[in-house]
Regions:
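Internal hydrophobic alpha-helix adjacent to the cofactor/substrate pocket in enzyme cavities
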Residues: 83-106, 133-134, 192-196
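A conserved short coil-to-beta-strand element within the FAD-binding core of flavoproteins
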Residues: 1-8
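Short, surface-exposed charged micro-motifs
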Residues: 1, 47, 60, 159-161
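Short, acidic, Ser/Thr-enriched surface-loop or helix-capping motifs
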Residues: 15, 58-59, 163-164
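FAD-site-proximal beta/loop scaffold in flavoenzymes
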Residues: 22-97, 181
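Glycine-centered tight beta-turn/hairpin loop motif at sheet-sheet or coil-to-beta transitions
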Residues: 16-20
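Short gly/ser/thr-rich secondary-structure transition/capping motifs
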Residues: 8-14, 48-56, 143
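Flexible, glycine-rich terminal cap/loop adjacent to redox cofactors
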Residues: 97, 114-124, 129-229
């Protein structure tokens, strides 16, 4: 629930353990999603499969009707972000022109442009558990990174999820300064099937926030240098 408070608003909710917790803020953002603007297309008449107006496509961005493609916010099951739509558009255009192209969701970052920034790509721990994937986790706090502190960004962390046996990078999740820039390294690592060792062996310039990526990989391998394992 949301209540008035001297600060502005008070949000009362329950945590994972069922305990009642509250937060106060000047403003409350209600983010409940958006409807696809497809009503005028009369998808049913075109026999284009959809879910409440969100169009179903394959990895070529082709709909249930051969030769008809859809991209962006009207597509079902994908983040409504500009770079997502752009990547989909390139894939659709390549296939329309007779080339072979496929959209890869696992390398598509989701980003939240706030303060601090947040970004994520690949699998989460919950998804690994649901899929029966054995994994290990590495973390590194922004508070232990010099450049992050210079940018007044000591809050947050980098979290890397990797396969337990071979160390292949499965997911990366970041909260902190320049997270929406840093996440591209995670997408590259996943797309290139890089391992923790390969990320560790890559020299990251100093002082930069990118060092947190390597430090998180070191932590996953129990080889941390600037934090505890």
């Amino acid at each position: 629930s949301v209540e008035d408070s001297p600060v502005g608003a008070k949000v009362v909710c329950k945590d994972k353990s069922g305990n009642t917790v509250s937060f106060e803020a000047e403003k409350v953002l209600v983010a409940i999603g958006r409807r696809a603007n497809t009503a005028a297309l009369d998808l049913a008449a075109g026999k284009i499969h959809n879910d409440k107006g969100r169009i179903l496509v394959n990895d070529k961005m082709e709909t249930s009707v051969p030769g008809v493609y859809a991209i962006g916010d009207c597509v079902f099951g994908h983040a409504q972000l500009a770079h997502t739509a752009s990547a989909m558009g390139e894939v659709a255009a390549e296939n329309i022109c007779g080339h072979e192209a496929h959209y890869c969701e696992k390398t598509n970052p989701t980003c939240v442009y706030m303060e601090p920034e947040a970004a994520s790509v690949g699998l989460t721990e919950e998804q690994c558990k649901a899929q029966g994937i054995a994994y290990k986790v590495g973390k590194f706090p922004m508070s232990a990174n010099g450049k992050a502190l210079i940018l007044n960004g000591g809050e947050g962390l980098v979290k890397i999820i990797a396969g337990a046996e071979y160390g292949e990078i499965l997911g990366m999740h970041i909260i902190g300064p320049r997270a929406t820039d840093l996440i591209a390294e995670g997408a590259l690592a996943i797309g290139g099937e890089m391992t923790l060792d390969e990320l560790i062996d890559t020299i990251h310039s100093h002082p930069t926030v990118t060092e947190t990526m390597r430090e998180a990989a070191l932590n996953a391998e129990k080889r941390a240098i600037h934090t505890k394992n």
